[in-house]
């Protein structure tokens, strides 16, 4: 790879599943189908929340943000994945790679923060139900969401800026499906200690702190639910949190594997380990956004009722 002072002249090559051409066709069809399901599921959920006034509450406001983040995240990476499966030379420009990495990292970091704010919302709703409308006012929950977005974007700017300063001498083969930051750091022909320190700080801010907020919130939530005398009351209270808790487990289970322990350039050379990490990252990047609308809507009477109302209104207007 030729490297000049102009970073846009640099090209990377994505390995993906190049060693398994038959699997590429299978994965292309599978990922395309999943991406369409992501757009459909999250698009419907966003539309329902926007157009049904009964869902104009803090919980659904955060859920709308979460769905929008899922659409943005997958749209920044899935088209590149699909194109790489079809292309003979799976190359991407340096600038294109950095843009894709920035968007993906920003959306992922923001989603971590949003999940933390959703836990706080459920904590207030269950532990302080009478004060909930006052504490979670429109100004409060909009500010919480805005803070999450700003944190995610700033964090991504910092990580991307540090990555762009690294020299890439000869090895330009990314052992991944997309321009994933850890895979790119492994290609640098310079000391990446600053990047590792920066990533560790990033993990603390957008992974550990939100997870602590979620954990502490649920400790108080469980304690409050256990004090509810009736079984029906306990079930109703827990049902409002079960979807969020399920998403948190899936989301953090995969993302911690990828980002909790940044590795130095020389620490991993195994091709098998690289492809396993890439597949887990693919699961995090595609499977989770596809499942989120299902998890939040299948057992949610409000969402199902809102969908029915919109469909009934559409059928009524079409019949006129």
UniProtKB/Swiss-Prot annotation:
SUPFAM superfamilies: Family A G protein-coupled receptor-like (SSF81321)
CDD domains: 7tmA_OR13-like
Membrane protein topology class: Multi-pass membrane protein
GO BP of this protein: detection of chemical stimulus involved in sensory perception of smell
UniProt KW Transmembrane keyword: yes
Transmembrane regions: 26-46, 55-75, 100-120, 140-160, 198-217, 238-258, 278-298
Glycosylation sites noted in the Swiss-Prot or TrEMBL record: 5
PROSITE patterns (alphabetical): G_PROTEIN_RECEP_F1_1 (PS00237), G_PROTEIN_RECEP_F1_2 (PS50262)
GO CC, alphabetical: plasma membrane
Major location (coarse): membrane
Extracellular side: 1-25, 76-99, 161-197, 259-277
GO molecular function: G protein-coupled receptor activity; olfactory receptor activity
Disulfide pattern: 97-189
Stored InterPro entries: GPCR_Rhodpsn, GPCR_Rhodpsn_7TM, Olfact_rcpt
Cytoplasmic side: 47-54, 121-139, 218-237, 299-320
Localization: Cell membrane
Stretches of the chain forming a coiled coil according to its record: none
Name of a matching Pfam family: 7tm_4
Keywords: Cell membrane, Disulfide bond, G-protein coupled receptor, Glycoprotein, Membrane, Olfaction, Receptor, Sensory transduction, Transducer, Transmembrane, Transmembrane helix
Record bears the keyword Magnesium: no
Similarity field: Belongs to the G-protein coupled receptor 1 family.
Protein purpose: Odorant receptor.
Family annotation (PANTHER family): OLFACTORY RECEPTOR
Protein name stated in the entry: Olfactory receptor 13C8
